[in-house]
């Protein structure tokens, strides 16, 4: 995954955004080892070591692909927002895969606020970082949960923020399917109720594909 991440970062041509990514998650950055190892969540999706990297990379790759299809999207801004949208989780969760818990800062401030301030501090260390670009990037971080009910203080108001939010939400939901499928007992087609999905998940199509392979063997 690290190689894929480095390749994606290399495609960000805007110099200030590229410098910011290198400062925060570059190979020599202090934040790289925790970003590489952290879980993406406590329960719902990618709640395991390297889960945050896996999730952010997947969101970044999808954002990159969609940016090439829809006109008007600032690809560099969208990719940077995708890779950094969850960086507050480095401070919000303990980095122990066997016992993922919210930290005091995670409980008192929340991962969105922690991510906002972490990125803003680094932006302030880059001379000449365009203020308008900083506003749009920070807006992606603040709005990526999509609604006030889900914890975002503001709603997505730009193309890039809307794109990151929607792909982030999609990635989380599909990650829930992966988790639920692993929890199925032999012969089960439905998972139990899942809060993230608002119901159960159905997996019969996967079992039907696997059965002929077993018969052929």
Regions found by a protein language model. Name each.
Residues 2-9, 39-48, 99-101:
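Short hinge/gating elements
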Residues 31-50, 57, 67:
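Pre-Walker A segment
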Residues 1-34:
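Extended, charge-rich, solvent-exposed interface segments
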Residues 157-217:
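Acidic, carboxylate-rich catalytic segments that either coordinate divalent cations
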Residues 45, 54, 65-183:
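Divalent metal-dependent catalytic cores for phosphoryl transfer on phosphate-bearing substrates
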Residues 13-17, 29-33, 127, 149, ...:
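Residue-level signal for secondary-structure boundary elements
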Residues 18-25, 34-40, 94, 152-157:
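Short coil/turn segments at secondary-structure boundaries
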């Amino acid at each position: 995954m690290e190689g894929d991440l480095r390749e994606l970062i290399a495609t960000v041509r805007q110099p200030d955004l590229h410098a910011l990514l290198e400062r925060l998650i570059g190979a020599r950055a202090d934040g790289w080892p925790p970003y590489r190892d952290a879980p993406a969540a406590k329960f719902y999706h990618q709640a395991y070591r390297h889960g945050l990297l896996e999730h952010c990379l997947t969101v970044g790759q999808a954002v990159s692909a969609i940016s090439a299809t829809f006109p008007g999207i600032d690809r560099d801004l969208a990719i940077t927002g995708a890779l950094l949208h969850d960086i507050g989780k480095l401070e919000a969760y303990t980095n122990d895969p066997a016992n993922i818990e919210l930290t005091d800062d995670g409980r008192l401030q929340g991962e969105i606020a922690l991510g906002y301030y972490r990125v803003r501090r680094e932006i302030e260390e880059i001379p000449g970082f365009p203020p308008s670009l900083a506003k749009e990037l920070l807006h992606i971080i603040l709005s990526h949960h999509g609604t006030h009910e889900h914890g975002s203080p503001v709603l997505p108001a730009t193309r890039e923020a809307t794109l990151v939010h929607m792909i982030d939400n999609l990635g989380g939901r599909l990650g829930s399917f992966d988790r639920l499928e692993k929890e199925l007992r032999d012969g089960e087609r439905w998972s139990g109720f899942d809060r993230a999905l608002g119901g159960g998940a159905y997996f019969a199509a996967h079992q039907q594909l696997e059965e002929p392979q077993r018969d052929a063997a």
